[in-house]
Protein backbone atom coordinates (compact mmCIF):
# COMPACT_ATOMS: atom_id res chain seq x y z
CA UNK A 1 0.00 0.00 0.00
CA UNK A 2 2.40 2.59 -1.33
CA UNK A 3 1.68 5.80 -3.24
CA UNK A 4 2.52 5.83 -6.94
CA UNK A 5 1.79 2.19 -7.76
CA UNK A 6 -0.94 0.76 -9.99
CA UNK A 7 -4.32 -0.17 -8.47
CA UNK A 8 -3.62 -3.86 -9.08
CA UNK A 9 -0.29 -3.68 -7.24
CA UNK A 10 -1.95 -1.77 -4.42
CA UNK A 11 -4.70 -4.38 -4.19
CA UNK A 12 -2.13 -7.17 -4.09
CA UNK A 13 -0.18 -5.47 -1.30
CA UNK A 14 -3.38 -4.70 0.61
CA UNK A 15 -4.69 -8.26 0.46
CA UNK A 16 -1.32 -9.71 1.43
CA UNK A 17 -1.58 -7.43 4.46
CA UNK A 18 -5.07 -8.74 5.32
CA UNK A 19 -3.91 -12.34 4.82
CA UNK A 20 -0.96 -11.65 7.09
CA UNK A 21 -3.27 -10.43 9.85
CA UNK A 22 -5.41 -13.54 9.42
CA UNK A 23 -2.29 -15.62 9.98
CA UNK A 24 -1.30 -13.43 12.95
CA UNK A 25 -4.70 -14.03 14.54
CA UNK A 26 -4.46 -17.75 13.92
CA UNK A 27 -0.99 -17.70 15.52
CA UNK A 28 -2.56 -16.71 18.85
CA UNK A 29 -3.42 -20.39 19.19
CA UNK A 30 0.19 -20.74 20.39
CA UNK A 31 -0.61 -18.36 23.27
CA UNK A 32 -4.25 -18.84 24.27
CA UNK A 33 -6.04 -21.97 25.39
CA UNK A 34 -9.28 -23.07 23.75
CA UNK A 35 -11.29 -21.96 26.81
CA UNK A 36 -10.58 -18.23 26.56
CA UNK A 37 -13.77 -17.22 24.74
CA UNK A 38 -14.07 -13.73 26.26
CA UNK A 39 -11.00 -12.56 24.38
CA UNK A 40 -12.26 -14.03 21.12
CA UNK A 41 -15.81 -12.68 21.51
CA UNK A 42 -14.59 -9.19 22.38
CA UNK A 43 -12.24 -9.23 19.39
CA UNK A 44 -15.02 -10.38 17.06
CA UNK A 45 -17.31 -7.62 18.33
CA UNK A 46 -14.60 -5.03 17.78
CA UNK A 47 -13.99 -6.38 14.27
CA UNK A 48 -17.70 -6.18 13.44
CA UNK A 49 -17.81 -2.50 14.42
CA UNK A 50 -14.67 -1.74 12.44
CA UNK A 51 -16.05 -3.36 9.30
CA UNK A 52 -19.45 -1.69 9.56
CA UNK A 53 -17.74 1.70 9.61
CA UNK A 54 -15.32 0.75 6.82
CA UNK A 55 -18.16 -0.58 4.67
CA UNK A 56 -19.86 2.81 4.74
CA UNK A 57 -17.01 5.33 4.60
CA UNK A 58 -14.74 3.37 2.25
CA UNK A 59 -17.29 1.62 0.02
CA UNK A 60 -20.86 2.92 0.19
CA UNK A 61 -20.09 6.65 0.42
CA UNK A 62 -17.83 6.62 -2.69
CA UNK A 63 -20.41 4.48 -4.53
CA UNK A 64 -23.19 7.00 -3.81
CA UNK A 65 -20.96 9.91 -4.83
CA UNK A 66 -20.00 8.22 -8.12
CA UNK A 67 -23.62 7.44 -8.95
CA UNK A 68 -24.65 11.05 -8.27
CA UNK A 69 -21.73 12.64 -10.14
CA UNK A 70 -22.22 10.49 -13.24
CA UNK A 71 -25.38 12.46 -14.05
CA UNK A 72 -27.00 9.52 -15.77
CA UNK A 73 -29.35 8.54 -12.96
CA UNK A 74 -30.77 11.86 -11.76
CA UNK A 75 -33.07 11.35 -8.80
CA UNK A 76 -32.50 7.58 -9.12
CA UNK A 77 -28.82 7.84 -8.21
CA UNK A 78 -29.49 5.50 -5.30
CA UNK A 79 -30.47 2.71 -7.70
CA UNK A 80 -27.02 1.34 -8.72
CA UNK A 81 -25.92 1.42 -5.09
CA UNK A 82 -29.05 -0.36 -3.89
CA UNK A 83 -28.74 -2.97 -6.65
CA UNK A 84 -25.06 -3.60 -5.98
CA UNK A 85 -25.56 -3.77 -2.21
CA UNK A 86 -28.42 -6.26 -2.53
CA UNK A 87 -26.52 -8.42 -5.03
CA UNK A 88 -23.49 -8.52 -2.72
CA UNK A 89 -25.56 -9.78 0.19
CA UNK A 90 -27.41 -12.21 -2.09
CA UNK A 91 -24.10 -13.60 -3.39
CA UNK A 92 -23.02 -14.70 0.09
CA UNK A 93 -26.51 -15.94 0.96
CA UNK A 94 -26.84 -18.05 -2.19
CA UNK A 95 -23.34 -19.44 -1.70
CA UNK A 96 -24.43 -20.56 1.78
CA UNK A 97 -27.49 -22.31 0.37
CA UNK A 98 -25.56 -24.04 -2.42
CA UNK A 99 -22.78 -25.46 -0.28
CA UNK A 100 -24.82 -28.45 1.02
CA UNK A 101 -26.06 -29.22 -2.51
CA UNK A 102 -22.46 -29.26 -3.78
CA UNK A 103 -21.57 -31.87 -1.19
CA UNK A 104 -19.79 -29.46 1.16
CA UNK A 105 -22.33 -29.42 3.98
CA UNK A 106 -19.63 -29.59 6.61
CA UNK A 107 -17.89 -26.48 7.87
CA UNK A 108 -15.12 -25.84 5.35
CA UNK A 109 -11.89 -25.55 7.35
CA UNK A 110 -12.77 -28.28 9.84
CA UNK A 111 -14.10 -30.69 7.22
CA UNK A 112 -11.03 -30.14 5.06
CA UNK A 113 -8.79 -30.78 8.06
CA UNK A 114 -10.65 -33.98 8.92
CA UNK A 115 -10.32 -35.22 5.34
CA UNK A 116 -6.55 -34.81 5.57
CA UNK A 117 -6.19 -36.26 9.10
CA UNK A 118 -7.29 -39.94 9.28
CA UNK A 119 -6.75 -40.16 13.05
CA UNK A 120 -9.15 -37.31 13.74
CA UNK A 121 -11.61 -38.69 11.21
CA UNK A 122 -11.69 -41.95 13.18
CA UNK A 123 -12.10 -39.95 16.39
CA UNK A 124 -15.01 -38.09 14.83
CA UNK A 125 -16.63 -41.37 13.78
CA UNK A 126 -16.15 -42.96 17.19
CA UNK A 127 -17.16 -40.07 19.44
CA UNK A 128 -19.48 -37.98 17.30
CA UNK A 129 -19.53 -34.25 16.76
CA UNK A 130 -20.39 -33.51 20.38
CA UNK A 131 -17.19 -35.07 21.72
CA UNK A 132 -14.86 -33.87 18.98
CA UNK A 133 -16.24 -30.33 18.99
CA UNK A 134 -17.67 -29.53 22.43
CA UNK A 135 -20.61 -27.15 22.65
CA UNK A 136 -18.34 -24.32 23.80
CA UNK A 137 -16.23 -24.73 20.69
CA UNK A 138 -19.01 -24.60 18.09
CA UNK A 139 -18.01 -21.63 15.96
CA UNK A 140 -20.11 -20.04 13.25
CA UNK A 141 -17.20 -18.42 11.44
CA UNK A 142 -15.36 -21.72 10.90
CA UNK A 143 -18.08 -22.32 8.34
CA UNK A 144 -21.70 -21.44 7.87
CA UNK A 145 -22.84 -25.04 7.61
CA UNK A 146 -22.46 -27.28 10.66
CA UNK A 147 -20.52 -30.51 11.09
CA UNK A 148 -23.88 -32.21 10.92
CA UNK A 149 -26.20 -31.65 7.99
CA UNK A 150 -29.08 -30.35 10.09
CA UNK A 151 -32.17 -29.85 7.96
CA UNK A 152 -34.84 -27.68 9.51
CA UNK A 153 -38.57 -28.21 9.31
CA UNK A 154 -39.25 -24.89 7.60
CA UNK A 155 -37.23 -25.74 4.52
CA UNK A 156 -33.99 -23.94 5.35
CA UNK A 157 -30.89 -25.56 3.92
CA UNK A 158 -29.33 -25.75 7.39
CA UNK A 159 -29.60 -24.35 10.89
CA UNK A 160 -27.15 -22.03 12.56
CA UNK A 161 -24.55 -23.32 14.94
CA UNK A 162 -26.58 -22.09 17.90
CA UNK A 163 -29.38 -24.45 16.90
CA UNK A 164 -26.90 -27.29 16.48
CA UNK A 165 -25.46 -26.61 19.92
CA UNK A 166 -28.95 -26.65 21.45
CA UNK A 167 -29.79 -29.93 19.76
CA UNK A 168 -26.58 -31.52 20.99
CA UNK A 169 -27.17 -30.31 24.51
CA UNK A 170 -30.73 -31.68 24.65
CA UNK A 171 -30.21 -35.08 23.11
CA UNK A 172 -27.64 -37.72 22.26
CA UNK A 173 -25.15 -37.13 19.51
CA UNK A 174 -26.52 -37.88 16.09
CA UNK A 175 -25.02 -40.97 14.48
CA UNK A 176 -22.43 -40.34 11.81
CA UNK A 177 -23.15 -41.11 8.17
CA UNK A 178 -22.67 -44.71 7.07
CA UNK A 179 -19.41 -45.91 5.66
CA UNK A 180 -19.05 -45.32 1.97
CA UNK A 181 -21.36 -42.32 1.97
CA UNK A 182 -20.31 -38.96 0.57
CA UNK A 183 -19.46 -37.69 4.05
CA UNK A 184 -16.65 -40.20 4.51
CA UNK A 185 -13.19 -39.97 2.98
CA UNK A 186 -12.54 -42.56 0.36
CA UNK A 187 -12.67 -42.74 -3.41
CA UNK A 188 -14.39 -39.37 -3.65
CA UNK A 189 -12.25 -37.68 -0.97
CA UNK A 190 -10.31 -35.53 -3.44
CA UNK A 191 -13.55 -34.30 -4.98
CA UNK A 192 -14.83 -33.41 -1.52
CA UNK A 193 -11.58 -31.67 -0.64
CA UNK A 194 -11.87 -29.60 -3.83
CA UNK A 195 -15.45 -28.68 -2.90
CA UNK A 196 -14.39 -27.68 0.60
CA UNK A 197 -11.57 -25.51 -0.74
CA UNK A 198 -14.17 -23.91 -3.02
CA UNK A 199 -16.36 -23.25 0.03
CA UNK A 200 -13.51 -21.57 1.87
CA UNK A 201 -12.77 -19.49 -1.23
CA UNK A 202 -16.36 -18.31 -1.67
CA UNK A 203 -16.71 -17.41 1.99
CA UNK A 204 -13.62 -15.17 1.87
CA UNK A 205 -14.10 -13.51 -1.52
CA UNK A 206 -15.89 -10.43 -0.09
CA UNK A 207 -12.89 -9.28 1.97
CA UNK A 208 -10.40 -9.50 -0.89
CA UNK A 209 -12.88 -8.09 -3.41
CA UNK A 210 -13.55 -5.07 -1.19
CA UNK A 211 -9.84 -4.21 -1.00
CA UNK A 212 -9.36 -4.61 -4.75
CA UNK A 213 -12.40 -2.52 -5.64
CA UNK A 214 -11.38 0.12 -3.10
CA UNK A 215 -7.95 0.60 -4.66
CA UNK A 216 -9.36 0.40 -8.18
CA UNK A 217 -11.69 3.29 -7.38
CA UNK A 218 -8.95 5.63 -6.13
CA UNK A 219 -9.13 9.04 -7.80
CA UNK A 220 -12.53 8.51 -9.41
CA UNK A 221 -14.32 10.80 -6.92
CA UNK A 222 -13.33 13.12 -4.10
CA UNK A 223 -14.18 10.50 -1.47
CA UNK A 224 -12.44 7.62 -3.28
CA UNK A 225 -8.92 8.43 -2.10
CA UNK A 226 -5.82 6.37 -1.48
CA UNK A 227 -6.25 7.00 2.23
CA UNK A 228 -9.81 5.66 2.09
CA UNK A 229 -8.69 2.46 0.35
CA UNK A 230 -5.78 2.08 2.77
CA UNK A 231 -8.13 2.47 5.73
CA UNK A 232 -10.44 -0.14 4.22
CA UNK A 233 -7.55 -2.62 3.97
CA UNK A 234 -6.62 -1.79 7.55
CA UNK A 235 -10.21 -2.38 8.69
CA UNK A 236 -10.46 -5.72 6.90
CA UNK A 237 -7.12 -6.72 8.38
CA UNK A 238 -8.43 -5.88 11.86
CA UNK A 239 -11.51 -7.97 11.12
CA UNK A 240 -9.44 -10.90 9.86
CA UNK A 241 -7.28 -10.97 12.98
CA UNK A 242 -9.93 -12.49 15.28
CA UNK A 243 -11.31 -14.56 12.39
CA UNK A 244 -8.02 -16.44 12.19
CA UNK A 245 -8.25 -17.14 15.91
CA UNK A 246 -11.93 -18.13 15.55
CA UNK A 247 -10.80 -20.98 13.29
CA UNK A 248 -7.57 -22.10 14.97
CA UNK A 249 -8.78 -22.04 18.59
CA UNK A 250 -11.67 -24.54 18.18
CA UNK A 251 -9.48 -26.80 16.04
CA UNK A 252 -6.87 -26.84 18.81
CA UNK A 253 -9.59 -27.71 21.31
CA UNK A 254 -10.72 -30.51 18.99
CA UNK A 255 -7.35 -32.23 19.25
CA UNK A 256 -5.38 -30.85 16.33
CA UNK A 257 -1.74 -30.05 16.94
CA UNK A 258 -0.96 -26.38 17.45
CA UNK A 259 0.79 -26.11 14.09
CA UNK A 260 -2.06 -27.80 12.22
CA UNK A 261 -4.62 -25.54 13.92
CA UNK A 262 -2.54 -22.52 12.90
CA UNK A 263 -2.26 -23.74 9.30
CA UNK A 264 -6.01 -24.17 8.83
CA UNK A 265 -6.63 -20.89 10.67
CA UNK A 266 -4.59 -18.86 8.20
CA UNK A 267 -5.85 -20.80 5.20
CA UNK A 268 -9.01 -18.72 4.79
CA UNK A 269 -7.03 -15.52 4.17
CA UNK A 270 -4.96 -17.15 1.45
CA UNK A 271 -7.61 -16.57 -1.23
CA UNK A 272 -7.99 -12.84 -0.59
CA UNK A 273 -5.09 -11.69 -2.83
CA UNK A 274 -6.72 -13.43 -5.80
CA UNK A 275 -10.08 -11.76 -5.16
CA UNK A 276 -8.37 -8.41 -4.60
CA UNK A 277 -6.49 -8.50 -7.89
CA UNK A 278 -9.67 -9.54 -9.72
CA UNK A 279 -11.62 -6.66 -8.15
CA UNK A 280 -8.97 -4.10 -9.07
CA UNK A 281 -8.71 -5.37 -12.66
CA UNK A 282 -12.49 -5.35 -13.07
CA UNK A 283 -13.02 -1.74 -12.03
CA UNK A 284 -9.95 -0.47 -13.91
CA UNK A 285 -11.09 -2.12 -17.15
CA UNK A 286 -14.80 -1.32 -16.73
CA UNK A 287 -15.09 1.98 -14.88
CA UNK A 288 -18.90 2.31 -15.31
CA UNK A 289 -19.41 -0.66 -13.00
CA UNK A 290 -17.61 1.09 -10.11
CA UNK A 291 -20.74 2.15 -8.15
CA UNK A 292 -22.15 -1.35 -8.48
CA UNK A 293 -18.83 -2.99 -7.55
CA UNK A 294 -18.27 -0.83 -4.48
CA UNK A 295 -21.83 -1.41 -3.28
CA UNK A 296 -21.55 -5.14 -4.06
CA UNK A 297 -18.47 -5.42 -1.85
CA UNK A 298 -20.21 -3.45 0.90
CA UNK A 299 -23.32 -5.64 0.75
CA UNK A 300 -21.28 -8.83 0.95
CA UNK A 301 -19.27 -7.49 3.89
CA UNK A 302 -22.32 -6.28 5.83
CA UNK A 303 -24.09 -9.61 5.29
CA UNK A 304 -21.08 -11.53 6.63
CA UNK A 305 -20.94 -9.21 9.66
CA UNK A 306 -24.64 -9.57 10.45
CA UNK A 307 -24.96 -13.25 9.61
CA UNK A 308 -21.68 -14.61 10.97
CA UNK A 309 -19.50 -12.39 13.10
CA UNK A 310 -22.08 -10.76 15.37
CA UNK A 311 -24.03 -14.01 16.05
CA UNK A 312 -20.81 -15.88 16.79
CA UNK A 313 -19.72 -13.26 19.31
CA UNK A 314 -23.08 -13.62 21.12
CA UNK A 315 -23.35 -17.39 21.60
CA UNK A 316 -21.00 -17.89 24.55
CA UNK A 317 -22.54 -15.55 27.11
CA UNK A 318 -20.34 -12.56 26.28
CA UNK A 319 -22.95 -10.62 24.33
CA UNK A 320 -22.68 -7.34 26.26
CA UNK A 321 -18.90 -7.34 25.96
CA UNK A 322 -19.13 -8.01 22.23
CA UNK A 323 -21.75 -5.27 21.75
CA UNK A 324 -19.68 -2.60 23.48
CA UNK A 325 -16.59 -3.79 21.62
CA UNK A 326 -18.56 -3.31 18.38
CA UNK A 327 -19.39 0.27 19.35
CA UNK A 328 -15.73 0.91 20.16
CA UNK A 329 -14.63 -0.62 16.85
CA UNK A 330 -17.09 1.53 14.90
CA UNK A 331 -15.89 4.70 16.63
CA UNK A 332 -12.23 3.82 16.07
CA UNK A 333 -12.71 3.10 12.36
CA UNK A 334 -14.90 6.18 11.87
CA UNK A 335 -12.18 8.30 13.48
CA UNK A 336 -9.52 6.76 11.23
CA UNK A 337 -11.60 7.30 8.09
CA UNK A 338 -12.52 10.89 8.90
CA UNK A 339 -9.25 11.89 10.53
CA UNK A 340 -6.84 10.18 8.12
CA UNK A 341 -8.99 10.13 4.97
Curated annotation (Swiss-Prot):
GO BP: any one term: zinc ion transmembrane transport
Pfam families (UniProt xref): Zip (PF02535)
Membrane topology: Multi-pass membrane protein
Compartments, record wording: Cell membrane; Nucleus; Cytoplasm; Golgi apparatus
One GO cellular component, as annotated: Golgi apparatus
Segments passing through the bilayer: 12-32, 44-64, 72-92, 193-213, 262-284, 289-306, 321-341
Keywords: Cell membrane, Cytoplasm, Golgi apparatus, Ion transport, Membrane, Nucleus, Transmembrane, Transmembrane helix, Transport, Zinc, Zinc transport
Catalyzed reactions per annotation: Zn(2+)(in) = Zn(2+)(out); Cu(2+)(in) = Cu(2+)(out)
GO MF annotation list: copper ion transmembrane transporter activity; zinc ion transmembrane transporter activity
Tagged with keyword Membrane: yes
Domain of life, per lineage: Eukaryota
Main location: membrane
Family recorded in the similarity comment: Belongs to the ZIP transporter (TC 2.A.5) family.
Protein's job: Zinc importer that regulates cytosolic zinc concentrations either via zinc influx from the extracellular compartment or efflux from intracellular organelles such as Golgi apparatus. May transport copper ions as well. The transport mechanism remains to be elucidated.
PANTHER family named in the record: ZINC TRANSPORTER ZIP11 (PTHR11040:SF211), ZINC/IRON TRANSPORTER (PTHR11040)
Name used for this protein in its record: Zinc transporter ZIP11
Native source species: Bos taurus
Gene: SLC39A11
Amino acid sequence: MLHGHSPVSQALLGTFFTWGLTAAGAALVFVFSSGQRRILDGSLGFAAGVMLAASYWSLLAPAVEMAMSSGGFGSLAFLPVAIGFTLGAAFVYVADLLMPHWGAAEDPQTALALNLDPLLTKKSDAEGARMLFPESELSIRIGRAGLLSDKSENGEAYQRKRAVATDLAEGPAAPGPPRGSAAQPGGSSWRRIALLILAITIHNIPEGLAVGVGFGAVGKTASATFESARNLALGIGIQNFPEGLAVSLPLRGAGFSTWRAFWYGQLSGMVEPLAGVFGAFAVVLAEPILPYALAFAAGAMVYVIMDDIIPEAQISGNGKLASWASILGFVVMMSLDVGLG
